[in-house]
């Protein structure tokens, strides 16, 4: 058994070398609304866009995916030897993608999520990860599209619903061409109907109502967040809300 594990780890190490790619120079990242995902998206750095198809979400097009499959015979063979099946291999590369994303290596993370997708077109993590990267890069329209593709695969995923709504709120704030903010409200409402104990969901619901200048509702939802987990309250947002209307309960000054 120990020998089998050793061989498996060795094969995975070889696989790592096979798909290893160099990192590009780093640049500063603008602070964003945090996602609901338990995986922390990096606030440190990001990498510039690359024209290499490996660093374009889903390799850029269906045609490019088909070309990648034709050219990836050795990679797929190594995966078949190293993992119990391709779904397992896909999950492996998804995990690596989240690790690189947390380290701020966005292009490297993109390639890992692309490999995740190449191995399993129905792995929600591929769309979730690539959508998170697009959000980090400020490509909100692309992020919304990718996250929604993930939501099609996992329609009752409340955390993913909140992440889609988070992108839409950021998009709405910058007056970009995204889905209507009413859709963000609908997603938040649905997620909280399924899981009313989600403090981050109530926080995002509060922010949505704040952007619509519904300050009473914003306070109501913020206090629901506070009652569940006060640590989720964003102090910057709290001060913005106070500047528009004082706390009706008098708890925050």
Please provide the spans of the model-predicted regions:
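Short coil/turn linking the two alpha-helices of tandem helical-hairpin repeats
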Residues: 104, 138-139, 165, 170-176, ...
